[in-house]
A protein has these predicted regions:
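Extracytoplasmic "Venus flytrap"
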Residues: 30-46, 60-71, 77, 92-93, ...
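An alpha-beta-alpha
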Residues: 48, 138-178
């Protein structure tokens, strides 16, 4: 299932970006994930890199390490490098700095594709997201199948819409169950 999702994500990225490819030359793609410490982003990036290599395109990958200022600077760098498309998994979906940098990129004619999270008050050219609320529900259901009771500690990443949705799905599923605190 994850592999099929990755194939779909890469397909959407290339379908949207291929409309921008110069008649001659390579497409330039800037990619910034919120972190590369997550296996999902490592796997996604490996697949995008594989396809970019096959097509002879240039892939610029940056890791903001959960720092919105750094991600904003990376977007500005991509704009200066005249990439055709920016693929972003935003550190913070409502960050004024990130949104301002994306607006400058869009004004420069760069297409923006959001992956696995949304941006508030900004319209992207394409978005590929999973149902994060449902993912939270599934995690809670699996926990309840494996454990009859549990004391739960949730770590949050405030401002990340996808993480907030997963947590909400989890909480909504277990809230009526007194065995899970």
């Amino acid at each position: 299932t994850i592999f099929l999702s990755l194939v779909f994500v890469v397909g959407v990225i290339y379908l949207n970006a291929s409309q921008l490819k110069p008649v001659r030359g390579q497409m330039r793609i800037g990619v910034t994930y919120m972190t590369m410490n997550n296996e999902f982003y490592q796997t996604l990036n490996a697949e995008i890199e594989r396809v970019a290599d096959e097509k002879g395109d240039l892939l610029l990958v940056r890791n903001p390490e959960l720092d919105e200022e750094k991600q904003s600077q990376q977007i500005d760098y991509f704009r200066q490098q005249k990439v055709n498309v920016i693929v972003i998994n935003p550190v913070k979906g409502d960050s004024p700095k990130i949104i301002a940098s994306l607006k400058r990129a869009q004004q420069a004619g760069i297409k923006i594709i959001a992956v696995d999270s949304q941006l508030s008050h900004f319209t992207v050219d394409a978005s590929v997201v999973s149902d994060n609320y449902q993912a939270g529900v599934l995690v809670a259901q699996r926990l309840m199948k494996q454990k009859k009771e549990a004391k739960i500690l949730l770590l949050e990443h405030k401002g990340t819409i996808s993480a907030e949705q997963r947590i909400q799905g989890f909480l909504d599923t277990i809230q009526s169950e007194p065995a899970y605190q």
